[in-house]
Amino acid sequence: MGKEEEIARIARRLDKMVTRKNAEGAMDLLRELKNMPITLHLLQSTRVGMSVNALRKQSSDEELIALAKSLIKSWKKLLDVSDGKSRDQGRGTPLPTSSSKDASGTTDLSCKKPDPPRTSSTPRITTFPQVPITCDAVRNKCREMLTLALQTDHDHVAVGVSCEHLSSQIEECIFLDVGNTDMKYKNRVRSRISNLKDAKNPGLRRNVLCGAITPQQIAVMTSEEMASDELKEIRKAMTKEAIREHQMARTGGTQTDLFTCNKCRKKNCTYTQVQTRSSDEPMTTYVVCNECGNRWKFC
């Protein structure tokens, strides 16, 4: 069994432990990983970092948590080294001198695009295309804030992705869609940052880091589309309830004294029956107290 297959096997076992909420034997697997020489290529291809990070978040064993943190920290160094090399390559192209500018007559000193980076023996963390460098202070600040949002909870280390590069991609897509850095642009960036940092919606951030949601998609998504699954279900339920209440109010209902309001104890009520489930299931009865406005329902 090759090294990549072995690491992938460990990752799958860790994922099962997280799903079953049973970490028995996890320490042995983490020790195996600690003794393996992990490269950026292996980190990205096996996604073992995400498995270790998920286990760390779920576990209450201090020794296991410490070992998982140690592994993630060591893998983060690989990420930092690659980011540093990428930045050095970006800065490696010297600015032209005044004499060379005079000779060419078309050189832009402020925003000259760097030459394509030379191929390196160190594999790239992401497959996202390069983005143009910007000299706009507002855009650069937005890229920095998006980077911090993507780095929330260190999921980027587990995935093995360059947050600086990915945030630049997202900002570039937002800028191209809006066309300027006015209030609409700033509000768009602010909403991305808020949703990416949301502790109740880690799935959005992980999907962006993994590439399941592309920079082009996250740049134009609405608040409803970025919401967590839990919030989407709540909104869906509220919409259904509002529709039912509207239907009940429109039909007027039937006045009766068969029901007693649990608030004012009066029997002056109006009820409406609505088929909310399949036709062979009992109808849902909605009751409104005509005295105090209290509402309730039952099947």
Curated annotation (Swiss-Prot):
The TFIIS-type zinc-finger regions cover 257-297
Q: In which tissues is it expressed?
A: Testis specific.
- Quote the biased-composition stretches of kind Polar residues, using this chain's numbering: 95-109
What positions does the entry give for Zn(2+) binding?
A: C261, C264, C289, C292
GO BP annotations of the record are: positive regulation of transcription by RNA polymerase II; regulation of transcription by RNA polymerase II; transcription elongation by RNA polymerase II
Pinpoint the TFIIS N-terminal domain residues: 5-82
Its chief place of residence is nucleus
Q: Return the PROSITE patterns for the record.
A: TFIIS_CENTRAL (PS51321), TFIIS_N (PS51319), ZF_TFIIS_1 (PS00466), ZF_TFIIS_2 (PS51133)
Keywords on this record?
Answer: DNA-binding, Isopeptide bond, Metal-binding, Nucleus, Phosphoprotein, Transcription, Transcription regulation, Ubl conjugation, Zinc, Zinc-finger
Could you tell me which residues belong to the region Disordered? 83-126
What sequence ranges are listed for the domain TFIIS central? 138-254
- Phosphoserine: which positions carry it? S59, S100
For the keyword S-adenosyl-L-methionine, the answer is: no
Where is this protein localized, as stated in its record? Nucleus
GO cellular component terms, semicolon-separated: nucleus
The GO terms describing molecular function are: DNA binding; zinc ion binding
Query: Subunit info?
Result: Interacts with the basal transcription factor GTF2B. Interacts with REXO1.
Function in brief: Necessary for efficient RNA polymerase II transcription elongation past template-encoded arresting sites. The arresting sites in DNA have the property of trapping a certain fraction of elongating RNA polymerases that pass through, resulting in locked ternary complexes. Cleavage of the nascent transcript by S-II allows the resumption of elongation from the new 3'-terminus.
Q: What is this protein called?
A: Transcription elongation factor A protein 2
